[in-house]
Amino acid sequence: MSNIVAIVGRPNVGKSTFFNRLVGARIAIMDDESGVTRDRHYGEAEWCGKFFTVIDTGGYVTGSDDIFEGQIRDQVDIAIDEADVILFLVDSDVGVHHLDQEFANKIRRSKKPVILVANKSDNNKRLHMSAEFYELGMGEVWPISSQNGTGTGELLDEVISHFKDEGEEDPNKGIPRIAVLGRPNAGKSSYVNALLGTNRSIVTDQAGTTRDSITSHYNVFGKEFIFVDTAGIRKKSRIKEDVEYYSILRSVKALEESDVCVIMIDAERGIESQDMNIIWMAHNNKKGIVILVNKWDLIEKDSKTAQVFQENIREALKPIDYPLIMFISVLNKQRLFQSVEAIMKVYENRGKRIPTSELNDKILKEIDYNPPPATKQKYVKIKYVTQLPTKSPTFAFFCNLPQYVGESYSRFLEHKIRGYFDFEGVPISIVYRKK
């Protein structure tokens, strides 16, 4: 079981900078704009052989009618509830703020170890100013600089002293990683929240609500998954803020690190150019692809509506013809568990291995019936085929003249492999080697 440390505090005290220092990567978005982190998100850290999960949270604000700030408070409450140790960050450059006092009163009631961290203590003046925070009545004050690392070693010694065990190294290893992608407001966060049964990400009718890629664990059918809810990806010309630009970079990174990409499409809008760009990105990165057409409950239907809609998607995506397509309604919870079964199938297809003997028995017969066409009076003779030990299905065909095999014949071989062995939802790579 991983130990959990939550980083909390009012806006713009450096929580995300400290989070990134602990986990050793720029996972959370950092910006001078207050309220950049809206959701809670997780990273893994280690200190002196002790492993722990770190939760970064949004800035806690009271007395505001802003819809986002109200939901951020809920996210912070959930993080506090999950945590074994709470790091309460304050700003030495500003001194004691009334929100610090209000938040101190709140977390004092949690009955959990709370460590008061005076961030931005990166010069002598601020170091002396950090003593002001003793008036919060939270015990010892730990001055640090998340920017340059000053004081973090001593702080982490204190943090791990509260752990009951050493935790796990890389607890996510081997767990299927699913990136939920799509245009803004396609229903990505609502989908993840519906599966989890909790408000893991903030959901409103306003596009662009999710700014960071939010990671969640999900157990179903005796299997564990990691779902990554991402910010909506839109065209570069429509990106108006630096923060949105960084959000999209995180979404692309989530795609690159995933095993299966779930692309959410709004049924009322149909498949659009940016949907196709995302699918092509997943294809080029050799990821499994599941297309979920959301808001299907809003479409007037007859017996052929789904078939026609699916044909339109496949026509738009040519020559990519393998994604698994499903129609769902997150609002009405229609086919949500079936969608997880589809994701599971695609994940298993991506890792499927075909024995060489079975592969040759089936595919060489097809090659005998339809050999590669001659090029420049050169005849290609394929001797055998084997599957390579790669993350996504790759098949090597050994032949006398690999340079003369055309792309159309590769598509023919891919079609036959799919017909015999069912690789729905995953790309297949064909390579040729000289024998």
Curated annotation (Swiss-Prot):
User: What do we know about how this protein assembles, alone or with others?
Assistant: Associates with the 50S ribosomal subunit.
Q: Where does GTP 1 bind?
A: 9-16, 56-60, 119-122
KH-like domain residues: 352-435
The gene it comes from is der
For molecular function, the Gene Ontology terms on record are: GTP binding; ribosome binding
Kindly provide the name given to this protein in its UniProt entry: GTPase Der
Indicate the family of this protein. Belongs to the TRAFAC class TrmE-Era-EngA-EngB-Septin-like GTPase superfamily. EngA (Der) GTPase family.
**Role this protein plays:** GTPase that plays an essential role in the late steps of ribosome biogenesis.
**SUPFAM superfamilies in the record:** P-loop containing nucleoside triphosphate hydrolases
* Entry keyword annotation includes Phosphoprotein: no
**Taxonomic lineage of this organism?**
Bacteria, Pseudomonadati, Bacteroidota, Cytophagia, Cytophagales
Q: Which GO terms describe its biological process?
A: ribosome biogenesis
Alphabetically sorted, this entry's keywords are:
GTP-binding, Nucleotide-binding, Repeat, Ribosome biogenesis
Q: Does the keyword GTP-binding apply?
A: yes
Give the matching InterPro entries. G_ENGA (IPR031166), GTP-bd (IPR006073), GTPase_Der (IPR016484), KH_dom-like (IPR032859), KH_dom-like_a/b (IPR015946), P-loop_NTPase (IPR027417), Small_GTP-bd (IPR005225)
Which Pfam families does the entry mention?
KH_dom-like, MMR_HSR1
Instruction: Enumerate the spans annotated as EngA-type G domain.
Output: 3-167, 176-351
Q: Which residues bind GTP 2?
A: 182-189, 229-233, 294-297
Question: For this UniProt entry, which residues form the secretion signal?
Answer: none
